[in-house]
Swiss-Prot record:
Gene3D superfamilies: 1.20.5.170, 1.20.5.340. The keyword Repeat applies. Belongs to the tropomyosin family. The keyword Coiled coil applies. The molecule is in a coiled coil structure that is formed by 2 polypeptide chains. The sequence exhibits a prominent seven-residues periodicity. Homodimer. Keywords: Coiled coil, Repeat. Residues 1-284 form a coiled coil. Tropomyosin, in association with the troponin complex, plays a central role in the calcium dependent regulation of muscle contraction. This is Tropomyosin-1. Residues 111-131 are annotated as: Disordered.
Length: 284
């Protein structure tokens, strides 16, 4: 019985440990929520960078348009200068130099525009990656919340079963003690009846020696013997019934021990699943 009580105490401690782990998982959920908010902030920052990159791209396009306009103006000036080749040779040379400078600037502008486009593409890819990771984190958080609810339900169910097992065990202990008392009383009664039979046997021997006893007394003694014999049989039956009751109570106690052991194994399996989930979250 002490072993069963110790097992019950151990189950209570395991239940409390399961509740503590549930609290730890709630704290882990809060931490994951904070990480998700941080990532959303990073996504917003990337969006701002993309907007700035778009602004830079627009400015580069405006610069390119200005350079194209200047190039068209230079072509017009060169066309007009062809009519005055002799007089405008030096001026044409200067315009050609301006054209080379403009072309160089145009090339630089196009290079910057290409770099800005690459930066915008990289920012878009980074934003999509963060969105995917945020979705995965949300799914993981939902799964963890479901596991936490299941753990609480199992802990409550185990607590109810523990109370029911303790109640049945207390009843079984009372019945067992009563059966033991009845068995002791039956054994005492058997001894008493055996002593009475011994006395009756001695009396019968005395009656056999004393043949002068009346037939009425002899019949009375025979009736007493039959009565005592019936009482002995009844006592033996009660003793047998008491032994059967004790065996039945012992089987119930064994069954309760098996139930307690099964609940302990269930707690152990649940603890392993929760620890594995926590390890996966930590590794993630």
């Amino acid at each position: 019985m002490d072993g069963i009580k110790k097992k019950m105490i151990a189950m209570k401690l395991e239940k409390e440990n399961a509740m503590e782990r549930a609290v730890q998982y709630e704290e882990l959920l809060k931490k994951k929520e904070e990480e998700r908010e941080k990532r959303e902030s990073e996504i917003a920052e990337l969006n701002n960078k993309m907007k700035q990159a778009q602004i830079d791209c627009d400015e580069a396009q405006e610069t390119l348009q200005e350079q194209m306009n200047k190039l068209e103006e230079t072509d017009k000036r060169a066309t007009n200068a062809e009519a005055e080749v002799a007089a405008m040779t030096r001026r044409i040379r200067l315009l050609e130099e301006d054209l080379e400078v403009s072309s160089s600037r145009l090339t630089e502008t196009l290079t910057k525009l290409e770099e800005a486009s690459k930066t915008a593409e990289e920012s878009e890819r980074g934003r999509k990656d963060l969105e995917i990771r945020s979705i995965a984190d949300d799914e993981r958080l939902n799964q963890l919340e479901d596991q936490q609810k299941e753990a609480k339900y199992i802990a409550e169910d185990a607590d109810r079963k523990y109370d029911e097992a303790a109640r049945k065990l207390a009843i079984a202990e009372v019945d067992f003690e009563r059966a033991e008392a009845r068995l002791e009383a039956a054994e005492s009664k058997i001894v008493e009846l055996e002593e009475e039979l011994r006395v009756v046997g001695n009396n019968m021997k005395a009656l056999e020696i004393s043949e002068q006893e009346s037939a009425q007394r002899e019949e009375s003694y025979e009736e007493t013997i039959r009565d005592l014999t019936e009482r002995l049989k009844a006592a033996e039956q009660r003793a047998t019934e008491a032994e059967r009751q004790v065996s039945k109570l012992q089987n119930e106690v064994d069954h309760l021990e098996d139930d307690l052991l099964a609940e302990k194994e269930r707690y152990k399996a649940l603890s392993g699943e929760l620890d594995q989930t926590f390890a996966e979250l930590t590794g993630y």
